[in-house]
Amino acid sequence: MKILIFIIASFMLIGVECKEGYPMGSDGCKISCVVNNEYCKGQCSYISTQEDKKWKGSDGYCYFWGLACYCTGLPENAKVWDSKTNKCGG
């Protein structure tokens, strides 16, 4: 029983440490793609979190329905697109 609780707690900690989302370009829009996963992996491995610092995401892929790159394994302070604060095109 203790092992089961430990495993569940471990999964919860892993989920807390990793952020996911759509990376933003300099214009505040999602980075678009069609079916190019390699392009998105490159974009996701070099996400800006501050003006002068870059952080690496663990992986990325082209989300077909959204026609945009989607990144996984990002640090918590990485800037990602959010529909609530969308300033794309404005």
UniProtKB/Swiss-Prot annotation:
One of its GO terms (molecular function) is sodium channel inhibitor activity. Residues 19-89 form the LCN-type CS-alpha/beta domain. Residues 1-18 form the signal peptide. InterPro entries: LCN-type_CS_alpha_beta_dom, Scorpion_toxin-like, Scorpion_toxin-like_sf, Scorpion_toxinL/defensin. The keyword Signal applies. GO terms for biological process: defense response. It comes from the Eukaryota. SMART domains: Knot1 (SM00505). Expressed by the venom gland. Keywords: Disulfide bond, Ion channel impairing toxin, Neurotoxin, Secreted, Signal, Toxin, Voltage-gated sodium channel impairing toxin. GO terms for cellular component: extracellular region. The keyword Cell wall biogenesis/degradation does not apply. Its main location: secreted. It is found in: Secreted. Disulfide bonds join C29-C88, C33-C62, C40-C69, C44-C71. Has the structural arrangement of an alpha-helix connected to antiparallel beta-sheets by disulfide bonds (CS-alpha/beta). Beta toxins bind voltage-independently at site-4 of sodium channels (Nav) and shift the voltage of activation toward more negative potentials thereby affecting sodium channel activation and promoting spontaneous and repetitive firing. Belongs to the long (4 C-C) scorpion toxin superfamily. Sodium channel inhibitor family. Beta subfamily. This is Putative beta-neurotoxin RjAa2f. It comes from Rhopalurus junceus (Caribbean blue scorpion).
